[in-house]
Amino acid sequence: MQIITNPREMQNIAENLRMKHQLIAVVMTMGALHEGHLSLIKLAKQQAGTVILTIFVNPAQFGENEDFHCYPRPFEKDSSMARAAEVDYLFAPDASMMYPEGFQTGIHNGPVAAILEGEHRPDHFNGVSTVVLKLMMICKAHIAVFGEKDAQQLAVIKRMTNDLNIDIRILEAPLLRDDDGVAISSRNIYLSSEERKQAAVLFRALSLADKRIQEGCTAAEKLIDEAISLIEQEPDAKIDYVSIVEAESFTQSALLEPGKEYRMVLAIWIGTTRLIDNRKYRVPLISA
């Protein structure tokens, strides 16, 4: 595995790989690697002969009073995990390389980025989209693998690549959970043992919605209210949002249509740790 820190060097390597007709897949991360990231790498390796892993804690996607400065950066551990996963290239630039003096261009997203995460974290997705586009241009990948856990981010990136005719295929990797149902996340390390127990309520709320949908409930407001009531039973839980959206477009829906796919998406504070989660549902067809 080669570790590259210079964007121009990474571009040159990727260009040479393309000239040799090598299929390239990229997995973009902020580091603090875990089993979820390893599953993305595994999927990338199944799809392409060369895998580039990027590690970059992107300052442009963090808002004021968020955890940019304390976000975990265990680079030695990350590089060891990447090597063990048989990554070909680890691209790990610093911020001065990605946003040099005078940098002033960025992506401005549309409605899909304005709701939910976008409402609670203004400009977050503009920062995400800008760095994702830069990494696509630097790594020159044919395929980019993203996790289902950040479902709205995935929808924003798909919208961007479609709108801007970016020649790259977006692959979605399934969300991974620990045995207690908590979605695997780098931020889980912030949770105390008691908070970790309470964090399992996110999965219970998503599972309750699944049960109710399979029973025939199609009123989004009722499903959301039931999820909120369950979450509010935990003493350290504070809700940013709970919503139901169409699975691909991320448009919010009041009534779920039979045969269509939707997601319940939620962002919950457990103590001082903000967790996001989601689950996809297919609404049963009505029997004749």
Curated annotation (Swiss-Prot):
Keywords: ATP-binding, Cytoplasm, Ligase, Nucleotide-binding, Pantothenate biosynthesis
Gene that this sequence comes from: panC
Swiss-Prot/TrEMBL GO biological process terms: pantothenate biosynthetic process
Assembly, per entry: Homodimer.
Keyword Cytoplasm appears in the UniProt entry: yes
Further facts: The reaction proceeds by a bi uni uni bi ping pong mechanism.
GO molecular function annotation: ATP binding; pantoate-beta-alanine ligase activity
Residues of the active site: H37 (proton donor)
Catalytic activity: (R)-pantoate + beta-alanine + ATP = (R)-pantothenate + AMP + diphosphate + H(+)
Sites where the protein binds beta-alanine: Q61
Protein name: Pantothenate synthetase
InterPro entries linked: Cyt_trans-like (IPR004821), Pantoate_ligase (IPR003721), Pantoate_ligase_C (IPR042176), Rossmann-like_a/b/a_fold (IPR014729)
Keyword Cell inner membrane in annotation: no
Database matches in CDD domains: PanC
Classification via Pfam families: Pantoate_ligase (PF02569)
A single cellular component GO annotation: cytosol
Subcellular location: Cytoplasm
Function recorded in the entry: Catalyzes the condensation of pantoate with beta-alanine in an ATP-dependent reaction via a pantoyl-adenylate intermediate.
